[in-house]
Amino acid sequence: MNIQANSCDLRSKLPLWILFFFTFYGNSVSAQQMDYYQHINRAEELFVLNHDPSCFKEFNKAFHTKARYFAKDAYIAAQIALYLKDDQKVLLYLKRAFEHGLPFTALTSAPIFQRIETNSIYPKIVQVYQSCQKPTFDAVVRDKIYDQCFKSDSLKFYMGRDSKKIAQFTQYEDSFRDYLKVEFLSKGIFPNENLIGIATDSIYEDFMRRFGHVDPYAAEEKQLFGSTNSIPTEYGLVSKYSFSVLLHSSCSFPNYQKLLYEAVLNGYMQPIEYGLLHETSVSWNQGMKNPHEGCSPLLSDAYYNILGFDPTKSTQTKIDESDTEGMKRVEKNRAAIGMQKYSIDQLKRIDQKNLGIKFFFYFLER
């Protein structure tokens, strides 16, 4: 039985108005998601340029679209509200962040929130968290992602320079990426925090306990230093495990580019993550280390100026700011995927340093 042929036959028999509806609906969802990114970008721009409440109008527009938004964006808005001493908006935006998966243990992720427990608003924040509607994430998918990531980490930890173990590791990671493509990317989604929740220490520890696993990296770190990393995993406000395996491959981006962009348009991948995958596919993987991979790096547009200049690399993705035409290209590439302007990101870095407002520039990978 030719399932593909039958499927095509069925589609050809669908009324035109139904086909038009699904096409229009898909385009509408994508447009709403891009509107969301643009409102968030404009809100950040207004703040770093003016440091006044004018940004809140754009934040509110973003959170009232029918797009799938990210807890980190509402958390950024809450930080700005705290800086501007607007308690009402602090509570409003934290409520939105909690409703979209911000763990309470991540509340103090930003320096500006480090001493929030001593602030008179803190009891109200606790009340908001306790009373708001918490999201439901796919725990079954999360367990499967975590389990595959654990197995990949374990193979990597023990492989050393053993060629057979290295081959076993690369083959396993290939199968992991195939799983992500078949089960998620091919359907326009990616198992990020909007599907499986923000990664937290407590959730990962619970997973390890239920599956009877021991993290070799954490065990070694504890043996050498007496403790593990003191920075909580949830401080990154991402679900990093499924993203890590894509970063490890030079071919993830070239092979899955269109599918990854669909995930961005559907709210299952942040624009900066898409850009980071593009840049790292060129900058981090300039030699084919995996014999099972075969692809050509997409260098021509791999310029977002996320990564810095690396003198050890023969091919750079960093454009010098003195290169006027090159910087126009950077801004064009960023705008095409809904990413913040490079010029505004530079101002955000200044505010992050001086004001303690965390803008979450980098994906955190162990």
Where are the model-predicted features located?
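Extended alpha-helical interaction scaffolds used for oligomerization/partner binding
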Residues: 219, 225, 230, 235-239, ...
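Structural register within alpha-helical repeat arrays
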Residues: 35, 42, 76-77
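Preference for long, solvent-exposed alpha-helical segments and helix-linker "stalks"
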Residues: 53, 63-70, 84, 88, ...
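Start-of-helix register in tetratricopeptide repeats
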Residues: 37, 71-75, 106
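Bacterial Sec-dependent N-terminal signal peptides
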Residues: 1-36
